[in-house]
Amino acid sequence: MKDIEASKKPHTTTVAPPQINFIKNNENIFQPKPISNVTTTTVQPPQIVSPPSPPSPPQTTTIAPPTILPTTKTTTTTTTTTTTTTTVQPPQIVSPPIINNLIIQNNLNTPSLSSTPSPLPNNNNSNENDNDINNLKISKEEYQTQIEIQQQIQRQQILERQQLLQRRNQEQLDLLERHNDYQELINTHQNFVPPNNRFSQQIHVSQLKKQSSQSQLQQQLSSQSLQQIQQKSKQPPPQQQQQQQPPPPPIPLLPQIHQQLKPKQQQEQQQQQEQQQQQTENERINELRRLKRKKEYHNDEYKDDEIYLDNILKGIDIRKLEKLTAVELRKIGKTLGVPMGNNTKGETFQRIKSFIENHKKKKQKYREYQSEKNQQQKSNSKKLVNNSTIYDLPIKDIEHLEQLFWRIFRNIVLFRKIIGNLSRGGFFDQQQQQQQQQQSTMTTTSSSSSPMTSSDDKFFYCYNYIFSKTFKYDQIIHVSWIVDSNYFGLLKYKVSRGDLLVFCNHNTINDGDVNDDEDQNTKYEFCKMFKKIFNSIRSIQDKSFYRDLFTNYSEFIFDRINKRYPIDIYLVGSLAIECNCLVATKLLISEFQFRPVMNHSLQLAIKSGSYKMVKLIVTTIHRQMSLNPNNKPFDIEMFSKINNPSIKIINLLIQLRLFTYSNIINLVIADAKLINDNNENDILQFNKNLKNQIFNYSNLLNSFTFNNNINNNNNNNINNNNNNNNNNNNNNNNNNNNNNSNLSNNTIEYSKIKTKTVFNQFTIKQLINSCKLIVTFDLKNQYQQQYYKRHYEDSDNEEEEEITQASFTINTMAEIEFIETQITKEEKHCFVKKVIQKQLLKDGEKEDYDGIKRLAELYVSLNPHLKVYCNFMYKIIYGNENCYDQDLDDEDLFDYRVTRVFDSNCFKQSLKYGSPGYWIEYKEVEMKYAFLSNKYRNEITPNLLFKYVSPNNLNKQLKFIKKIYNSSIENGNSNGNGNGNGGTVIGGILDRLLLFYLIIENNNLELLSIVIKEFPLISNFCYIAKSNSEIYNLKIPRFIRSIEMLEFCFSNFRDHFYLPQSNSLTADFYGFQNVELLRKYDQLMVLDDMDKGIIVSNKKVRASFDDFHFIFEWGSSLKNYNNYLKMLAYIVEDPYGLYTIVTNEILLLSAILSPTTSSGEPLLNLNIERQLIFQEIISSFSTILEGTELKYYPEQMFQESTHLKRFFDWIFENRSEDLLIGGRCVITQSVQSHMLYRAGRLDIVLRKGYYYDDTNEGSKKIMPVGLALVLDDIGKYGDVVALEKYIRSCIPLMKQQSELLTLLDKDERESRACFSQCQRHFSSLLSKASIYGRINIFQHIFYNHQFIFDKKSLLFARKGFLSKISFKKLILECHYHKQHHILDFIQNVIGLDITPKQIKSN
């Protein structure tokens, strides 16, 4: 039994899964069988078969262990791997007729199958063992099945492990083979990979070192795998098995079978094999790890396969691949991972080429996908997430903030900490909290009478100053605050409940003597608030909200505040119409008797662009007209300030007879049926091609203005007839006066709309629609008829003027549609100006933009007297071709446009398009020079000449220069004795000189060389007296943009680089705009020996403040200011010894001026580039300070607190000695304290202590140094943190009440002086807080230091800390500056029942 128990233990063997068969007589047990890639070994379940002639009693057979045959082909190979699936089933037990023929072979743990079995025992003992066998029959069967199953499972596990190791070894060998192939390719073709390729260099250097180790590793792996597999299997080949086949042994007894199964030697061998297997497996794992580390070390820059492949493909040249052999191409394809077969060289090359092209296409698609993704992120950057009110942050930042919030919210420790700070205010320790609680209990009991302080729920709690102020439901009563905070849901809820709401702060103070400015401001705030409400709440479901709003709060909305500026139902209705809130407008008309006004209401409705709103207002007005016949018809004049009314709206106006344009009515509604006044749905439909198109009507205003004159004349005639005035002369005089007044009004109003032209604000689509409208209504011919009637109707000529129809390039709708087909969809949405500019820069044929030119000509031809700027732009763009009226020539055009005033915009446009007409007509040189001086200060890139002229179009450029050149010579010769600059010889020279400088600014050396040859007098230099500052400040260095142009000008025009000053020539260094040009200029001066007599070395750098103000645009941008300081630092360093710095010159003092931009852009923001510029400014400034004895003023240098803070940090860290008395930093003690506070260093000010006033007898301790400006800023900006530091650190009088009493008893005079000083400063602080609306200052003092506001305490019985005069002053300032929330706080919370009216009466 012990042997049986021992045999049940699991066995671990290294052989392959055996094959189990029962052998019949004369059957070869070693006959091999074919094994496929998937070998399945099936073990049949045991079956008990009865013999053919069973005797009686039944015979019991003794079953020996089954024969186990090993499978063949168990050795591992490096090329292919086999997967063996073994299905383990219980062995089949057969009871043969003769037991002696059953051979049982049990050699599971023997090294080979040739071992001989044990001899057959004696027959004498057979009878004795029969009983034992019968007793152990069941246990033996179970025992045999369990043993076989366990053995098969173990063998299967071992086989799977071997296969896994084989696959790993094969992968490693393949990797080594790929590296060897690539190394051979590099060695054979060195020119294949460029030497600059980093990957090839690494392979080239490290491959020789790895070659020996990789070959040795490959041999070791192959030998180890083969040895281990052979040791595990140890199976002879099939031929040896057949030769060593022993004769069938007899059946052994049961104890002998157990001895064969588990001998001690086999157990020891098995343990040794297990240990060897574990060791080899560990060695193999370590080797693979080592190889992996080597690969990571070698490919540390190519961790990603795509990057690894990209670096390989960078070094491959497809043209060189064609010269390689087929074997080399296959190696390259194998290295790249391209599948290779038995292909020819051409096929292999095509496969590699297609692989490389496909890889490039994939990378391109990936880049396009990333770019689209980035664009989507940018477009979604300002969208809201979860109804957030953060508009400035992109979506990613909002999501990160939300994630951070929920992480903190789930953290119990952080959540309790934050809630604890919110509950106690976050500022004070436990003792101060207790004092605050005691004070709060006192205030609640004392102020329980007021409605705002009756309970804790009525207070304006300000728990945390870090996050925000928190208000309770009943405290939110101001509608303006609710609307500004976008809490429209809260507004709806409060209106539905009928809660208390304050719509206008002015209603709380109803005084009779209110200023007009206050009324206007109140009306503006009211309109702004209701505009937000109408724009946000406009759905049909909100009808109940507006009904409750207008019903329950009518006294606050519709009642008039005063007699001058009423806020009534008309104003509210007009706001609803303007905001296109159809729900509120319908409700006001139907239930609240709101009646729209003809001109104003309809104008607002058309301006909104909503057809439904226009229809509602028009039908309402039309009903009123039917009831009131005195209403005048609607005039086209209301379109003067409206943009883009639709054709559908115009149809409705024509239908209801509100559009009084006689010719259009005759053309359009001649065949229309009569329209019922009450019919709202009967809409006239005309011109189906223009039904849904939109046009810009504001730019067509000038085409209809002549009708106003006719209407005015007709109205005057009608009025005169009604008044029975039959004097024709009077009528004629009235008509003439009306015409003259209209013309004068047109010229005055023209200055407001002069820049609104087709070339500035029109898109191509709007231009096409406007031309369609002109052709449809035949407006051009109608205008000409009215124009000639107005000018020639009352003339004395007997001959009648014949009025003929004018012919234009476009006369029919088909021509416009043909032009429209030639324009792409993308160009239709572009501005006309941009399309024309692109066409001009391309220098294409005229046919390319002839269609746009014809459309512009048709538009400009309509009423050219009021479209002179359009005519001017058309002329400078398209040349001398006149599209305006025939009686308006070129000279009249310029005289009519601007005869007395120089227009810088027209001058700029003429330079950009290369049109010389405006330059020639206006001969005032001073105005041109003044424009260029201002231009340099306002524009960063001021290159204007030939901006929209193609660089290849030299003919147009030379033509422009020639006309101006000849005109300047003619003017100089004709008026040589003139006194002014314009028209004189000097004026002509200056005119040519200005043109010459602009050509230099264009930075075109080819054009400049041609101009010098053809126009030699253009470069003549003329010295001008300094009195004329505008002309004096234009110098050649300001126009040079490159080093090449500097070298050319220095060698050819040297006289232009020196200035007359103090009867000596001085170089103009500050005209250059960057230090590189200045350094090059100094190099040219040093290298040139001919100028030694003129250029004086060690010359003084002198200039006036005005020179810098006009010459260098130091205030235009931060970049230019940085360049300016770099130039000053370069001059201070003086590498060539050319400059001597005068220490107190205004030149250096101008460096400390504020570098704020003209657009108000701050110096620093989160942009990294601007931070780097700021660092460069600091480094340049430090260089200037080190090389000179200049004193500087920090307050003048930087106005922003963030800039000043960084600058003071730099001073404290690097130049702290400048802050001492008499130091280079010029600043007073008060200003220094103020600057320290603005730099965030209030602690330094507070540590200085008190200063003493020695004006009176004895020294009096009054206040810390220079805190007056600091306290003003605390009240101005609402800085409660600094206020608390000031109260706790600087004013010991207010720490405790007992301390104050003791101080008063010790030295009454000194204490009273300090007390009065505190009063003054606190009243000033509260005054600033009341002016700027900082209610948090009042809340902080009231809830934490209430004794400052308490007048009834014993402490201030003799004199309150803040007197009544101070409180009255605060109330008046709150009233004057419209800070009514602070006024409510003072009256209701603090408890001062004083009104501004009472204060004024007293």
UniProtKB/Swiss-Prot annotation:
<keyword id="KW-0132">Cell division</keyword>
<feature type="region of interest" description="Disordered">
    <location>
        <begin position="429"/>
        <end position="453"/>
    </location>
</feature>
<feature type="compositionally biased region" description="Low complexity">
    <location>
        <begin position="254"/>
        <end position="279"/>
    </location>
</feature>
<keyword id="KW-0677">Repeat</keyword>
<keyword id="KW-0175">Coiled coil</keyword>
<feature type="region of interest" description="4 X 7 AA repeat of T-T-T-[IV]-[AQ]-P-P">
    <location>
        <begin position="12"/>
        <end position="92"/>
    </location>
</feature>
<feature type="region of interest" description="Disordered">
    <location>
        <begin position="210"/>
        <end position="292"/>
    </location>
</feature>
<feature type="compositionally biased region" description="Pro residues">
    <location>
        <begin position="48"/>
        <end position="58"/>
    </location>
</feature>
<dbReference type="GO" id="GO:0030587">
    <property type="term" value="P:sorocarp development"/>
</dbReference>
<feature type="repeat" description="4">
    <location>
        <begin position="86"/>
        <end position="92"/>
    </location>
</feature>
<dbReference type="InterPro" id="IPR051904">
    <property type="entry name" value="UPF0746_actin_org"/>
</dbReference>
<feature type="compositionally biased region" description="Low complexity">
    <location>
        <begin position="38"/>
        <end position="47"/>
    </location>
</feature>
<keyword id="KW-0131">Cell cycle</keyword>
<feature type="repeat" description="3">
    <location>
        <begin position="60"/>
        <end position="66"/>
    </location>
</feature>
<dbReference type="GO" id="GO:0000281">
    <property type="term" value="P:mitotic cytokinesis"/>
</dbReference>
<feature type="region of interest" description="Disordered">
    <location>
        <begin position="712"/>
        <end position="745"/>
    </location>
</feature>
<feature type="compositionally biased region" description="Low complexity">
    <location>
        <begin position="210"/>
        <end position="234"/>
    </location>
</feature>
<feature type="compositionally biased region" description="Low complexity">
    <location>
        <begin position="59"/>
        <end position="94"/>
    </location>
</feature>
<feature type="compositionally biased region" description="Low complexity">
    <location>
        <begin position="430"/>
        <end position="453"/>
    </location>
</feature>
<feature type="region of interest" description="Disordered">
    <location>
        <begin position="1"/>
        <end position="20"/>
    </location>
</feature>
<comment type="function">
    <text>Required for correct organization of the actin cytoskeleton and cytokinesis. Also required for apical sorting of prestalk cells, a prerequisite for formation of the tip at the mound stage and subsequent formation of the fruiting body. May be required for cell adhesion.</text>
</comment>
<protein>
    <recommendedName>
        <fullName>Defective in tip formation protein A</fullName>
    </recommendedName>
</protein>
<feature type="compositionally biased region" description="Pro residues">
    <location>
        <begin position="235"/>
        <end position="253"/>
    </location>
</feature>
<keyword id="KW-0217">Developmental protein</keyword>
<keyword id="KW-0293">Fruiting body</keyword>
<feature type="region of interest" description="Disordered">
    <location>
        <begin position="109"/>
        <end position="133"/>
    </location>
</feature>
<keyword id="KW-0130">Cell adhesion</keyword>
<feature type="repeat" description="1">
    <location>
        <begin position="12"/>
        <end position="18"/>
    </location>
</feature>
<feature type="region of interest" description="Disordered">
    <location>
        <begin position="37"/>
        <end position="94"/>
    </location>
</feature>
<dbReference type="GO" id="GO:0098609">
    <property type="term" value="P:cell-cell adhesion"/>
</dbReference>
<feature type="coiled-coil region">
    <location>
        <begin position="350"/>
        <end position="383"/>
    </location>
</feature>
<feature type="repeat" description="2">
    <location>
        <begin position="40"/>
        <end position="46"/>
    </location>
</feature>
<dbReference type="GO" id="GO:0009986">
    <property type="term" value="C:cell surface"/>
</dbReference>
